[in-house]
């Protein structure tokens, strides 16, 4: 928006030292604020339990806007009220050429500081903290036209180097995070006319602000929450928001924001509790979760561009713009009150006074890391606005936040995960049961098939056995037949053997006969060969029959052994193996079913424990919230009681201030007409407040930045000062200094009136009179008298000065500090009660002065005459009420006792007044004093003659 005429800062990059804690150079470091309780959790800690926390002070930087066209138009006549010392992190605020004050901040940016350096010093530490899981806030505050929107909301479309904190923060976050596992979403809102509106969805207006009763976290449930895709998407969303934001043209800024802009960046990052970490879980739940417990880091970053405070006479706002300015100033005032209360460690922080303070509740005094950049202009024409902005930053530096990481177990997702696992295991168990039943049926089927096969095998075996037996019988019969054949062959062989023997014998005989019958040789040889061949064939056939018989015997033995083995195998081994396999399968399924049932029981137990833990945690949080609400109600009741008591006591303030200097104890301000019983009751209430609250706490309220608190506190002090027993305590505790400081700094008429009354009561004591004068009390009272025309305030001031006039040691100082002139000057009001106090003061002064002169401690004309009081007395001695006339007559008579005053009395016509007093005065002592003066002074006697 700065590109459209908003105030801007020239980007010149400079590198400074890292920021350090700072405060005003003439004061000590800001006091630490005690951390407030918060439902969030810090590392290291359990998923849902609060752990340790870190205290972090609000970091404040100041940025000076360059001269704008209006400043440059003055040329050499331009008067700057700001002098920067960036290297010392200081700035000097010049009220005039001889008076200036120095302030220290965490960082001071000159008009040449670049946008990049401002981001790295102010916002980058907060963004990095948000990425670690902490909440964070970056906020710009300052007068309209000093460059807040340029610093925070500049998009930098034409020149990326001019990009503001919003763009740079989102660019930083997107460069670090992984959008696959993490998520980034933004909401862009504006607070316009005390109504929260959505800049990304303009139709959404008057969005409610909701506070979580358990954690106290503030949320805006009706606001649009847009998931970020990339940097280009970011620019589109920010441009849409800027176009929908309200702005107007004023004398101080051509594009003045008319609403507070709030960019909320929601970050969610996944995390896990690793083995061996210091993370602890609730008692009794250590074994319920896996080793790596899924966690979620949730954090949010608020970047706030506040609308500038403005004065109608300077901005030139008209019509509806006046209404806008009123709401802007009201919300900024509420924010200032909260900052003041936090800086002063007030027990009550008025965050509910406006929607802005409700939204920023966590940013100041809460659990967020906060950086504030205040922007100022150089022109002395806006000195008061610049001073107010600087003091706002100084007070913010005193605030200490307790930052916490919001790291928690997502019990809902964990419950869903466990429930899903239970369902999965249940279905798995059912599937396994079905599978078991199916396999059991299959095994039973296989068993039946095996039994059938076994039966078939038995039948087959029996048949084979029968066949083998039949074959055996056949073989046996064959063997028997072969044996018979063999026997026959043996018989034949025996016969043949016998024949061979016979033939051999015959051969021998034939050999013998061969010689005898050569002719028969061939026949014999052929017959021999034929017989030999036949013998060989018979021998071979015999061997074959023997071999066949042995083979048949072996085959028969093998078949018998196979039959026996088959019977044993099928009857024992196969059946036993099937039974073992069936038993083993049954045991495995039973074991699996038992394991699944135990796992399901454990998961159900885990589910019940998680539910009970959640329920117990909710009950504890509800009890804590009820206890906290009770304490807050009790505090509000006590504060209301204190305010009511203070209000009642303030009504009796004027009636409790007494006169002094030996003129009696008649109250010089009392015209209330209240009864003694009411006064006694009021004093009893004051004593009760004094005992319950304590004087130091009451005096501390005098320094409060809230006007109503100051008024009530000074009324209580004034009433306490009306009692002699309390005056010494008030002075010892610094009450006199606080009252004088309040009289000097405050511009409120009520505070002036009551403070002057309190000082008048303290001035009843002689020792207090000297302290009041030495601390410049008379000068301050005279200053108030010259600035106000309020009769009641002037009555209080005149009463205080009248009491001081009763101390002769202070007369010279009273004259030098303008006290006598102030008394005489208050006659201009014409108010009878004011004039009565003036006359009482003159009487006190003249009486004490006369006593000192008569004792020889002083000579010369009266100081009253030197200030022109005599002429006033002569002219007005008979113009007022009886009591006022008595005081004037008494003062006149005491002045007449000093012979050095005779000439002035004669010249002013005072002889006639003395003669009148000596005859007509209502008091005998006054008439006697007048006669004494006339008779004892030769000059008077001569004048009478």
UniProtKB/Swiss-Prot annotation:
Binding site for ATP: 142-149
Coiled coil (UniProt feature): 415-644
Region annotation (Disordered) ranges: 1-54
Localization (cell): Cytoplasm, Cytoskeleton
ARM repeats: 683-722, 724-764, 766-806, 808-847
SMART domains: ARM, KISc
Disulfide bonds listed in the record: none
Entries under PROSITE patterns matching the protein: ARM_REPEAT, KINESIN_MOTOR_1, KINESIN_MOTOR_2
GO molecular function: ATP binding; ATP hydrolysis activity; microtubule binding; plus-end-directed microtubule motor activity
Keywords linked to the UniProt accession: ATP-binding, Coiled coil, Cytoplasm, Cytoskeleton, Microtubule, Motor protein, Nucleotide-binding, Repeat
Domain Kinesin motor: 57-399
CDD domains documented for this protein: KISc (cd00106)
Motif segment (D-BOX): 369-377
Any single GO CC term annotated in Swiss-Prot or TrEMBL for this entry: kinesin complex
Low complexity compositional bias, start-end: 22-31
Main localization (coarse): cytoplasm
A Pfam cross-reference name: Kinesin
Domain description: D-BOX motif functions as a recognition motif for the ubiquitination machinery.
Xref: PANTHER family: KINESIN-LIKE PROTEIN KIF11, KINESIN-LIKE PROTEIN KIN-UC ISOFORM X1
Protein name per its UniProtKB record: Kinesin-like protein KIN-UA
Native organism: Oryza sativa subsp. japonica (Rice)
Gene: KINUA
């Amino acid at each position: 928006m700065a590109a459209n005429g908003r105030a801007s800062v020239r980007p010149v990059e400079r590198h400074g030292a890292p920021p350090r804690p700072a405060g005003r150079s003439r004061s000590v470091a800001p006091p630490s604020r005690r951390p407030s309780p918060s439902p969030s959790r810090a590392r290291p800690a359990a998923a849902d339990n609060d752990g340790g926390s870190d205290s972090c002070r609000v970091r404040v930087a100041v940025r000076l806007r360059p001269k704008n066209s209006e400043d440059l138009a003055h040329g050499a006549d331009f008067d700057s009220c700001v002098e920067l010392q960036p290297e010392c992190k200081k700035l000097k605020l010049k009220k005039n050429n001889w008076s200036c004050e120095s302030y220290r901040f965490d960082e001071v940016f000159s008009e040449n500081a670049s946008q990049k350096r401002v981001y790295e010093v102010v916002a980058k530490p907060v963004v990095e903290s948000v990425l670690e899981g902490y909440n964070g806030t970056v906020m710009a505050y300052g007068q309209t036209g000093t460059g807040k929107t340029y610093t925070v909301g500049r998009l930098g479309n034409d020149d990326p180097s001019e990009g503001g904190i919003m763009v740079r923060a989102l660019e930083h976050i997107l460069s670090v995070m992984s959008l696959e596992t993490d998520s980034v979403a933004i909401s862009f809102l504006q607070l316009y006319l005390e109504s929260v509106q959505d800049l990304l969805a303009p139709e959404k207006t008057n969005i409610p602000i909701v506070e979580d009763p358990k954690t106290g976290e503030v949320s805006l449930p009706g606001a649009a929450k847009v998931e970020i895709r990339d940097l280009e998407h970011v620019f589109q969303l920010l441009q849409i928001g800027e176009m929908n934001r309200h702005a107007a043209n004023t004398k101080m800024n051509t594009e003045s924001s008319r609403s507070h802009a709030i960019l909320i960046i929601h970050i969610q990052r996944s995390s896990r509790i690793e083995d061996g970490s210091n993370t602890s879980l609730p008692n009794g739940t250590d074994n319920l979760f896996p080793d790596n417990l899924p966690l979620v880091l949730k954090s949010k970053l608020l970047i706030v561009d506040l609308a500038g405070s403005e004065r109608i006479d300077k901005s030139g706002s008209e019509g509806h713009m006046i209404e806008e300015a009123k709401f802007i100033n009201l919300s900024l005032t509420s924010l200032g009150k909260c900052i003041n209360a936090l800086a002063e460690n007030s027990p009550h922080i008025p965050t509910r006074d406006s929607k802005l303070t409700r939204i920023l509740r966590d940013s100041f005094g809460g659990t967020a890391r906060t950086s504030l950049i205040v922007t100022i202009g150089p022109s002395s024409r806006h000195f008061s606005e610049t001073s107010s902005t600087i003091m706002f930053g100084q007070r913010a530096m005193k605030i200490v936040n307790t930052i916490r990481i919001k790291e928690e177990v997502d019990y809902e997702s964990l419950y869903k995960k466990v429930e899903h696992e239970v369902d999965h295991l249940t279905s798995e168990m059912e599937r396994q049961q079905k599978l078991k039943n199916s396999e059991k049926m299959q095994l039973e089927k296989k068993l039946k098939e095996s039994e059938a096969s076994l039966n078939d095998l038995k039948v087959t075996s029996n048949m084979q056995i029968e066949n083998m037996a039949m074959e055996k019988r056949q073989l046996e019969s064959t063997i028997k037949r072969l044996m018979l054949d063999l026997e026959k062959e043996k018989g034949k062989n025996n016969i043949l053997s016998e024949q061979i023997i016979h033939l051999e014998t015959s051969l021998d005989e034939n050999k013998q006969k061969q010689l005898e019958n050569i002719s028969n040789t061939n026949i014999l040889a052929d017959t021999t060969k034929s017989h030999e061949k036949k013998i060989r064939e018979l021998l071979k056939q015999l061997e074959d029959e023997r071999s066949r018989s042995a083979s048949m015997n072996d085959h028969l033995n093998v078949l018998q052994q196979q039959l026996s083995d088959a019977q044993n195998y099928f009857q024992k081994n196969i059946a036993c193996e099937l039974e073992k396999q069936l038993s083993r399968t049954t045991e495995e399924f039973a074991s699996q079913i038992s394991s699944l049932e135990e796992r399901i029981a454990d998961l159900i137990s885990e589910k019940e424990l998680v539910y009970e833990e959640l329920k117990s945690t909710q009950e504890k949080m509800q009890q804590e919230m009820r206890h906290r609400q009770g304490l807050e109600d009790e505090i509000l009741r006590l504060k209301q009681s204190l305010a009511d008591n203070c209000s009642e006591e303030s009504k009796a303030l004027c009636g409790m201030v007494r006169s002094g200097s030996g003129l009696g104890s008649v109250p010089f301000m009392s015209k209330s007409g209240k009864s003694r019983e009411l006064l006694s009751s009021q004093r009893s209430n004051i004593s009760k407040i004094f005992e319950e609250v304590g004087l130091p706490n009451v005096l501390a309220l005098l320094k409060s930045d809230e006007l109503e608190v100051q008024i009530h506190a000074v009324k209580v002090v004034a009433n306490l000062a009306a009692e002699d027993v309390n005056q010494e305590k008030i002075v010892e505790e610094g009450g006199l200094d606080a009252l004088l400081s309040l009289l000097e700094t405050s511009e409120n008429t009520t505070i002036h009136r009551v403070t002057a009354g309190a000082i008048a009561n303290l001035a009843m004591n002689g020792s207090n009179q000297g302290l009041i004068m030495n601390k410049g009390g008379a000068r301050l009272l005279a200053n108030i008298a010259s600035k106000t025309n309020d009769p009641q305030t002037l009555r209080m001031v005149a009463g205080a000065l009248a009491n001081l006039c009763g101390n002769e040691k202070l007369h010279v100082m009273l004259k030098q500090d303008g006290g006598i002139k102030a008394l005489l000057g208050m006659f201009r009001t014409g108010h009878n009660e004011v004039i009565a106090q003036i006359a009482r003061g003159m009487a006190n002064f003249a009486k004490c002065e006369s006593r000192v002169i008569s004792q020889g401690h002083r000579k010369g004309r009266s100081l009253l005459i030197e200030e022109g009081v005599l002429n006033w007395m002569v002219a007005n001695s008979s113009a007022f009420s009886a009591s006022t006339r008595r005081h004037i007559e008494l003062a006149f008579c005491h002045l007449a006792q000093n012979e050095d005053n005779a000439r002035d009395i004669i010249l002013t016509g005072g002889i006639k007044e003395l003669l009148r007093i000596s005859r007509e005065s209502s008091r005998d002592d006054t008439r006697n004093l007048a006669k004494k003066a006339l008779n004892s002074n030769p000059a008077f006697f001569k004048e009478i003659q």
